Amino acid sequence: MNRVTAHTGSKYPIIQAPMGWIARSQLASAVCNAGGFGVIETSSGEVDNCKAEIEKMSELTDQPFGVNLPLLFLRDESMVEFCVQHGVKFVTTSAGDPSKYIDILKYAGITVYHAVPSVEGAIKAADCGVDGLVVEGTEGGGFKSPEEVGLFVLIQAIRKQIDLPIIAAGGIADGAGMAAAFAVGACLLYTSDAADDSIR
């Protein structure tokens, strides 16, 4: 167990990326049941569907899971309250200022990690009181810094400034990438791989 798995409760230090329209209950529960940490997306903006997917998780797994809240694209703020009311224990925020909902989430006992593409963003997130960081290098999907800093360089730069647990996001696809991420200070790894039932 490391600092991030202590927060997620997952067996393995692997977290499934919250890909829009893809990271729904089928994928997230499969990851959870395999020992990783599944995350439900809300970036699609399909609020009712995403809420239904969160509710389905209790039927598909008895393992902990998370929800991603992309702040710039959160079309319905009721999603935040829904997470609180439905016992979600881990939230990743991204694409915006985490201070907007940090007090509500933390008051409810929810662990909050914020996705950052830069050292400056990491410092701001830490100052807001997040519990950890999703450090996203230029190799990853989603929103990245125009400075295009590689993941391993970015993790090391942030680690020198901030002592928060780090999830590494971007371009990690095999054991060598995992080992490298752990070596530079990551505690958990984002992966975006998806498989159908025949090869899950």
Please annotate each region the language model reported:
Residues 1-161, 165:
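Active-site entrance/lid segments in N-terminal catalytic domains of soluble metabolic enzymes
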Residues 120-128, 173-185:
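Catalytic cores of alpha/beta
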Residues 133, 185-189:
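Active-site-proximal beta-strands of protease catalytic cores
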Residues 157, 184, 198-200:
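Surface cap/lid and interfacial helix-loop subdomains adjacent to catalytic sites
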Residues 163-167, 177, 193:
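A generic structured-segment signal
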Residues 168-172:
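Glycine-rich adenosine-cofactor-binding loop
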Residues 190-200:
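Single conserved hydrophobic/aromatic residue that forms the stacking wall/gate
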